[in-house]
């Protein structure tokens, strides 16, 4: 097995032939045509006109969007770029695009202008202090922490997604520390980058 040689455990061979398994999450419907146009717009540094729906606005709504990166965050893909409707850099979920995307010419909004994308933050995670010393030691070992802390470098624009994947709630502590497990130690340092901070 590869993990014996590298220390990294990935499931790349067919699972039916192995002693391992993985979750099969439902896939979100993503239009190939829309993704092709978004990738073309990224390479050409162009704007694209798209129809987009969201939970806050479930009706088809046209947007002019200047994409710069496609990101897989957990179980979904989104595209990062400048939204002219919102007048700022945003993440749009790929499965929420509707209709046909059309290129609209050069974009004045470059990836270098996306402060949250260009900024690197360090997330400092630690075992929930409400856990017993033995429980904290388990997590310290799981995550190979040094001095009971795990430091993770990430783009500020991706910090929320990383925290969600690590099941770290930044707003309140879960009622049971076994459910919370990890806490964000340096919340004040990265507060400006957190959703609904």
Across the structure, where does each feature detected by a protein language model lie?
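Core beta-strand-centered patch of the WYL/Sm-like small regulatory domain
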Residues: 17-146
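Polybasic (Lys/Arg-rich)
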Residues: 117-197
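Bulky hydrophobic/aromatic content
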Residues: 1-53, 165, 169-177, 181-186, ...
């Amino acid at each position: 097995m590869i993990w014996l040689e590298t220390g990294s455990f990935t499931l790349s061979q067919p699972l039916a032939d192995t002693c391992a398994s993985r979750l099969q999450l439902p896939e979100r419907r993503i239009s190939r045509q829309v993704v092709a146009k978004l990738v073309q717009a990224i390479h050409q540094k162009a704007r694209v006109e798209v129809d987009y729906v969201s939970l806050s606005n479930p009706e088809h709504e046209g947007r002019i969007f200047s994409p710069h990166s496609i990101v897989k965050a957990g179980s979904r893909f989104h595209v990062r770029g400048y939204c002219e409707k919102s007048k700022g850099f945003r993440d749009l979920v790929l499965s929420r695009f509707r209709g046909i995307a059309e290129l609209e010419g050069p974009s004045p909004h470059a990836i270098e202008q996306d402060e949250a994308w260009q900024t690197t933050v360090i997330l400092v995670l630690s075992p929930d202090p409400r856990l017993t010393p033995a429980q904290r030691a388990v997590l310290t070992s799981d995550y190979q922490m040094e001095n009971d802390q795990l430091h993770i470098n990430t783009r500020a624009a991706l910090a929320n997604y990383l925290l969600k994947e690590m099941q770290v709630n930044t707003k309140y502590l879960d009622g049971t520390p076994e459910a919370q497990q990890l806490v964000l130690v340096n919340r004040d340092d990265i507060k400006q980058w957190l959703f609904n901070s």
